[in-house]
Amino acid sequence: MEPDRQADIAALDSTLTTVERVLDVDGLRARIEKLEHEASDPQLWDDQARAQRVTSELSHAQGELRRIEELRARLDDLPVLYELAAEEGEGAAEALAEADAELKALRADIEATEVRTLLSGEYDEREALVTIRSGAGGVDAADWAEMLMRMYIRWAEQHKYPVEVFDTSYAEEAGIKSATFAVHAPFAYGTLSVEQGTHRLVRISPFDNQSRRQTSFAEVEVLPVVETTDHIDIPEGDVRVDVYRSSGPGGQSVNTTDSAVRLTHIPTGIVVTCQNEKSQLQNKISAMRVLQAKLLERKRSEERAELDALKGEGGSSWGNQMRSYVLHPYQMVKDLRTEYEVGNPAAVLDGDIDGFLEAGIRWRNRKDDE
């Protein structure tokens, strides 16, 4: 094997060894054993919330361990591939090309796994609460907000992460004014928090009779889901509860009872709505979870020197954009912070955003070290 390839394999081995140490593979195996024991308890499903948490954590831990073990097995097999290529004779060139392709693919997969070790923030391990709001751009902006919502939900589905939609406020003509949903997966907050900010879309408007180019904006906010250890207690007298009928696209009612709930936190003026559950009680519980997350954000912001610690600065306008999605006159999605770009917007809008997430996490880590 050539010295350059030996050096590449040695470098990958060093990186993967560091990943195995930081992620504590032995501890991960012990955690899986503990969760499997909990999952085998016949009484587990008496508590639906606990059962879902245990099974979700178990699935994630098993997937993480399987991914690391597969990377180690592939790395161990790589020198053998090069040895076999050298013995191929006439087919040596093709076999060598296959080994080089595996080396390249393995490097990308190990680097992607390495990103997970950078999620060490106080709340990074939490599930994520995502809110999307349409900004400047009229009906195109509302449509753009709905496209972003679909993008994140598709990303979650591709990773088999459960998504729970709490509220969707539909615009009159098309799209949404806002939406709030949770991504139930460990480290969802640490991963998706780099998506906070204003996302800009440039395209030929499907709503313009003259087919003119339109620029639209939408804002993405990502918060950590609140846990009992956060001690976010809300006195009953601090919250005003209003109920109303759920509405769908175009403002049409989708429920004959007043099941939708609007919570107003009187001391701060924070307003939260939830209408996606079937009962008023379920909507109230979900809305309270969102309100707690927003109050946690407010608490953290007050404790930090920079107000944008959890929330992107400013509103949905040109000067605050963090990523640009151009569909016309050319095809490009570019992150303005990391310079990471992709020439296939269709794939990105269908949930293929891991490259942007990894680049964003590395960018944030460098910023924190400065």
From Swiss-Prot:
Superkingdom of this protein's organism: Bacteria
Posttranslational modification: Methylated by PrmC. Methylation increases the termination efficiency of RF2.
Predominant location category: cytoplasm
Gene3D superfamilies documented for this protein: 3.30.160.20, 3.30.70.1660, Release factor (1.20.58.410)
Annotated keywords: Cytoplasm, Methylation, Protein biosynthesis
GO cellular component: cytoplasm
Modified residue annotations for N5-methylglutamine: Q252
InterPro entries reported for this sequence: PCRF (IPR005139), Pep_chain_release_fac_I (IPR000352), Pep_chain_release_fac_I_sf (IPR045853), PrfB (IPR004374)
PROSITE patterns referenced in this protein's UniProt entry, alphabetically: RF_PROK_I
UniProt-annotated location(s): Cytoplasm
SUPFAM superfamilies, alphabetized: Release factor
Cited NCBIfam families: prfB
PANTHER family: CLASS I PEPTIDE CHAIN RELEASE FACTOR (PTHR43116:SF3), PEPTIDE CHAIN RELEASE FACTOR 2 (PTHR43116)
Similarity comment: family membership: Belongs to the prokaryotic/mitochondrial release factor family.
Cited function: Peptide chain release factor 2 directs the termination of translation in response to the peptide chain termination codons UGA and UAA.
Full protein name: Peptide chain release factor 2
Gene encoding the protein: prfB
